[in-house]
UniProtKB/Swiss-Prot annotation:
Chorismate binds at residues 302-303, 417, 437, 451-453. L-tryptophan binds at residues 47, 267-269. Belongs to the anthranilate synthase component I family. Heterotetramer consisting of two non-identical subunits: a beta subunit (TrpG) and a large alpha subunit (TrpE). This is Anthranilate synthase component 1. It comes from Spirochaeta aurantia. One of its GO terms (biological process) is L-tryptophan biosynthetic process. SUPFAM superfamilies: ADC synthase (SSF56322). Its EC number is 4.1.3.27. One of its GO terms (molecular function) is anthranilate synthase activity. It holds the Pfam family Anth_synt_I_N. Keywords: Amino-acid biosynthesis, Aromatic amino acid biosynthesis, Lyase, Magnesium, Metal-binding, Tryptophan biosynthesis.
């Protein structure tokens, strides 16, 4: 039974806008993950802070309306399996997302409202954000689009403060359904008592590391050495190479996500099901967030493993904060964040709000800072995303030179790794996170990847071990010790 129904009609918010239907139902008996499994969610967005506990909202995309993809310089509209080129005056997919978002207005609620889609930008999308030259012939064994966003007719938003469920229905000029009927069908499914979909939760699965065409450990150590030489030569202040791990497993990605979110609760947790492949993550690192005209970047650089005892944990924290190399690396990335925001923020508004504090997660701890600025009047979240992509924490400084060195050294395209995942709202607000501590499932192969910042005094063996530390939580969710 619906507790409350609101239909936001075009004449209320502007004649050109489409209506949004919101219905509210009790949610005390349910969990977001259980609902995601029961209802076959295509997208799950959740958050858990080490300081504040669980964030207020979890979001599920239940019924896909269409998707928008970018491959090379072409943008495609895909609906019901049929694909057509987007013929519009756009620079890239980000302009297209904004076009769809602006078919709606903000519903006046605090919860996330992704009318502009939910999806990812690959690392290689950076070539469309600045003058960056990447090797067009570089292998891409994952065969992924440069960017892909899902748009929904029906979302479920779970309010953890009130235990209420908001069912949100959206139509677009290019895709329309009976929203009242769609929301009623979801409400009936929520309350039908059939939870058989949860029967496979916790089932055992085997996992094994697969060989690659090159030795990932030795290649990574060689790349650390090569990146260090770029620093010595004065070409870079820092570079961030990465390495890949392939794991064979029949474990469904949604089950791996369940295990990861339980063992490694993080501020940014997501599961995205694109059909042929799934992407999931539990990680602390924001890319850029824009809300109410304020843009924020939170550089995370400097890592130590967690201690086995409280005393060891405190000792490792003190060691991390006293590490000259780690602090220098972190300062460079704070300066890079200030520079990125300075491109699209009002003069004099960019400032470091918090600096050099420690955040702890299940397997590692990090040094974190927060940089904020007020957007210029003619800028939106899309401009902030373009100006800051990719993050300095996964590329280096100077950013363009570091990206081109990464492209030369790494044997395959990164694709999902160190890109971003996020969603866009009608007013230009957005929330994006960096796709690290993440995994992609395609067929029976799970793909993990990690890297680290390289400066003058980096040690290849220590840097290699750090990549294992960063992948360990995800690997353990697959039942694999690395």
């Amino acid at each position: 039974m619906f507790l409350f129904v609101e239909t936001i009609r075009p004449q209320q918010r502007g004649e050109s806008l489409l209506e949004t239907v919101i219905k509210v139902v009790p949610g005390e008996r349910f969990t977001p993950y259980g609902l995601a499994l029961k209802l076959g969610a295509r997208v799950v967005l959740e958050s858990s802070s080490s300081k504040k506990g669980r964030d207020r909202y979890s979001l599920l995309l239940l019924q896909e309306a269409f998707r928008v993809a970018q491959e090379g310089t072409e943008v495609y509209f895909v609906k019901d399996g049929r694909r057509s080129k987007v013929k519009a005056n756009h620079r890239d997919i980000l302009d297209v997302l904004m076009y769809f978002a602006r078919q709606h207005s903000d519903p006046g609620q605090d919860f996330p409202f992704p009318a502009g889609g939910v999806g990812y930008l690959s690392f290689e999308f950076c070539r469309y954000c600045d003058t960056i030259h990447l090797n067009p012939a570089k292998p891409d064994p994952l065969e992924l689009p440069d960017a892909l966003f899902l748009f929904g007719h029906v979302f479920l938003i779970y309010d953890h403060y009130t235990d209420l469920i908001y069912l949100v229905g959206l139509n677009y000029k290019e895709a329309s359904i009976d929203l009242e009927a769609a929301l009623a069908a979801v409400e009936a499914r929520v309350n039908d008592g059939d939870w058989s979909a949860l029967g496979s939760v916790g089932a055992p699965y085997d996992a094994e590391v697969l060989p690659q065409d090159y030795d990932p450990d030795e290649t990574y150590k060689a790349n650390v050495g090569a990146m260090r030489q770029e620093v010595i030569a004065g070409n870079l202040l820092q570079g961030v190479p990465s390495r890949r791990l392939l794991v064979k497993t029949e474990m469904p990605a949604i089950e791996a996500y369940r295990r990861l979110r339980s063992s490694n609760p993080s501020p940014y947790m997501f599961y995205l099901d694109f059909g042929d492949y799934q992407l999931f993550r539990a990680s602390p690192e924001l890319h850029v967030k824009v809300k109410g005209g304020t843009a924020e970047i939170r550089p995370i650089a400097g890592t130590r493993r967690r201690g086995a005892t409280d005393a060891e944990d405190r000792a490792l924290e003190a060691e991390l904060l006293a590490d000259v190399k780690e602090r220098a690396e972190h300062l460079m990335l704070v300066d890079l964040a200030r520079n990125d925001l300075g491109r699209i923020c009002q003069p004099g508004t960019v400032q470091v709000k918090d600096s050099y504090f420690i955040e702890r997660y299940s397997h590692v701890m990090h040094i974190v800072s927060s940089v904020e600025g007020r957007l210029k009047d003619d800028k939106t979240g899309i401009d902030a995303l373009r100006a800051s992509f990719p993050a300095g924490t996964v590329s280096g400084a100077p950013k363009i030179r570091a990206i081109e060195v990464i492209d030369r050294l790494e044997p395959v395209q990164r694709r999902f790794y160190s890109g971003v995942v996020g969603h866009l709202s009608p007013d230009g607000s957005l929330d994006t996170c960096i796709a690290i501590r993440s995994a992609l499932k395609k067929g029976d192969t799970m793909v993990l990847q990690a890297g680290g910042g390289i400066v003058f005094d980096s040690n290849p063996d220590r840097e290699l071990e750090e990549t294992y530390e960063k992948m360990r939580a995800t690997a353990r969710s697959l039942g694999l010790e690395i």
